[in-house]
């Protein structure tokens, strides 16, 4: 019985990072818009699409999108927004005002809206 309890405990502890990763608890409930210049192109090689943008004040934002498949279904690809282009992201920023990170639900590029999390807001 101890062996089973140990295995269950190890399994539960190994799953904690995944649960922590997928939560929105570290982000504000209110929605924020950030417009910036793409400094690191869209990457769809991970659990979520990512990119970096620099706002008018010079802050570099870590932008997290939906999982790659959902992000692509919304029309966002790795080649859509070249470095230097302007994009507006809409989503939930990190609760820490000194952390420039946002989980986006939508983004606008070249006048087109891309809804990566339909129904989220």
Predicted regions and their residues:
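Short aromatic-glycine-enriched beta-strand elements
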Residues: 44-54
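Short, glycine/small-residue-enriched coil/turn segments at secondary-structure junctions
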Residues: 24-44
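Extracytoplasmic
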Residues: 31-33, 46-48, 86, 102-104
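Short, structured beta-strand/loop micro-motifs enriched in basic residues and often containing a Trp
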Residues: 65-73
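Short nucleic-acid-contacting surface segments enriched for D/E, G, S/T with interspersed K/R
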Residues: 73-89
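Sec/Tat signal peptide C-region and signal peptidase I cleavage site
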Residues: 16-20
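Positively charged n-region of N-terminal signal peptides that target proteins for export
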Residues: 1-4
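OB-fold/S1-family single-stranded nucleic acid-binding modules
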Residues: 94-118
């Amino acid at each position: 019985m101890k062996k089973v309890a140990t295995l269950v405990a190890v399994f539960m502890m190994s799953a904690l990072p995944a649960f922590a990763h997928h939560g929105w608890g570290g982000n504000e409930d209110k929605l924020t818009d950030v417009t910036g210049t793409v400094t690191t192109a869209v990457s769809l090689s991970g659990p979520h699409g990512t990119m970096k943008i620099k706002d008018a004040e010079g802050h570099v934002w870590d932008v997290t999108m939906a999982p790659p498949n959902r992000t692509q279904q919304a029309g966002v690809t790795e080649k859509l927004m070249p470095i230097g282009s302007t994009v507006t992201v809409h989503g939930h920023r990190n609760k820490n005002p000194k952390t420039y990170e946002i989980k986006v639900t939508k983004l606008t590029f070249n006048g087109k809206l891309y809804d990566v999390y339909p129904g989220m807001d």
